[in-house]
Amino acid sequence: MEESVNQMQPLNEKQIANSQDGYVWQVTDMNRLHRFLCFGSEGGTYYIKEQKLGLENAEALIRLIEDGRGCEVIQEIKSFSQEGRTTKQEPMLFALAICSQCSDISTKQAAFKAVSEVCRIPTHLFTFIQFKKDLKESMKCGMWGRALRKAIADWYNEKGGMALALAVTKYKQRNGWSHKDLLRLSHLKPSSEGLAIVTKYITKGWKEVHELYKEKALSVETEKLLKYLEAVEKVKRTRDELEVIHLIEEHRLVREHLLTNHLKSKEVWKALLQEMPLTALLRNLGKMTANSVLEPGNSEVSLVCEKLCNEKLLKKARIHPFHILIALETYKTGHGLRGKLKWRPDEEILKALDAAFYKTFKTVEPTGKRFLLAVDVSASMNQRVLGSILNASTVAAAMCMVVTRTEKDSYVVAFSDEMVPCPVTTDMTLQQVLMAMSQIPAGGTDCSLPMIWAQKTNTPADVFIVFTDNETFAGGVHPAIALREYRKKMDIPAKLIVCGMTSNGFTIADPDDRGMLDMCGFDTGALDVIRNFTLDMI
């Protein structure tokens, strides 16, 4: 545990003296950039609903480039990308597009060099190109210069033939851009035979590739690549169910390779299920039950249950308890969010999802910080959370369980007529936690109370998290003041996160205090935001 720091000394280089001679956790432009890369906004609020990206969202990023720190910005973009610290890819790709079109030469060069690292799949590359097109007018610059052509050519040339074939046949186009467009505009010269085959396939089609290579002596690699491309073409033209299944099994074709018609076949889905990644499996449980791929007692149900209960698979796919909970609640309802698809939930799968929920707690990495969670227990917490199928009390209970089970030092309290302890222990089930919360008489949600209570009771906490619906009433003391008082009294650089889970917008966080964050709604991205914020990465 870090030693506590006197409030009168800077907590780290990120703190600057304020006029009262105390220390406020100042937000620097680099912090603002980190927030933008993580969730698309430089401010202190995480919104679930999609925010439109424009230059006005990235003022700190532009200031950093103007201050000669553009190469540092590129380094941060690469770090966020490699370490998977972003809730969505768009802000990071937008930032890279800005850097690649700015007037600073070294920033520009570093941005183009980073394209292959940051744009890991074709979808990212297409999105990056579209952002460049969107920015062309406002940044008053050209687009298709030599540097971009080289960056695109390198993106294709750095991949092996087989890897590129997999990528271009799975992710064909996005935002109006296709591989054919990019190859035409970049004047690519393939660096290997494998790449020459794939690029010819993209620009001229399978027929020409087949004609060119049918008489040639082929290496094992080339033969494998041609067979794969042939399978991708064959599957597009066949209506024979058995042939589709054979091609899926032999060449590991995925859903994106198939026609809509193929997906009406139960047997085709059974073939896809064999190699289906866990995230796709969780997404498709309802669909596969609705179309009778999963029927009580069949071998497919056994396979699904086996995958869901495999701790190694859960860890490898980085499945969080929250992901499982969403899948479980969605599956349990027996219909899709828009209500068209309907199914009868399978009992064995429900049991497996329930077991997986508890297994995935082991895959969550502790942060090593001290947490104080304050939960709103009012009846309005039964409302549906923005961005989720879950209600607010279920999200709050699940998050209390995650923290209690993974962090050594945590405390849960509830808003009653005063702050009261809410007993959440590591051996409790979700139902037991919800029951414990429902038995506490509800009081008003005054977001300053957790800090006031912790100060009174001398409870040390690095991070306060308030879980409420949209009641973020501030009492006589503003939460920002209560937090600063707590920091001063306890000598702890504490942070505050307020999750207004059914709220479209509220403002509690002081935008100039780096240790405060508001969250409107709650989704799987919110988990990354909380983790990054706790660990000082944003």
Swiss-Prot record:
Gene3D superfamilies: von Willebrand factor, type A domain. One of its GO terms (biological process) is cilium assembly. Residues 120-284 are annotated as: RNA-binding. A divalent metal cation binds at residues 378, 380, 445. One of its GO terms (cellular component) is nucleoplasm. Its main location: cytoplasm. The keyword Phosphoprotein applies. Residues 16-369 form the TROVE domain. The modification N-acetylmethionine is found at residue 1. The keyword Transport does not apply. InterPro entries: TROVE2, TROVE_dom, TROVE_dom_sf, vWA_Ro60, vWFA_dom_sf. It comes from the Eukaryota. The modification Phosphoserine is found at residues 4, 19. Keywords: Acetylation, Cilium biogenesis/degradation, Cytoplasm, Metal-binding, Phosphoprotein, Repeat, Ribonucleoprotein, RNA-binding. Identified in a IGF2BP1-dependent mRNP granule complex containing untranslated mRNAs. Found in a complex with PUF60 and Y5 RNA. Interacts with RAB11FIP5. Antibodies against normal cellular SSA2 protein are found in sera from patients with systemic lupus erythematosus (SLE). The horseshoe-shaped TROVE domain is built with 7 helical HEAT-like repeats, and is closed by the VWFA-like domain giving rise to a ring-shaped monomer. Single-stranded RNA is bound in the positively charged central cavity. Belongs to the Ro 60 kDa family. RNA-binding protein that binds to misfolded non-coding RNAs, pre-5S rRNA, and several small cytoplasmic RNA molecules known as Y RNAs. Binds to endogenous Alu retroelements which are induced by type I interferon and stimulate porinflammatory cytokine secretion. Regulates the expression of Alu retroelements as well as inflammatory genes. May play roles in cilia formation and/or maintenance. This is RNA-binding protein RO60. The gene is RO60.
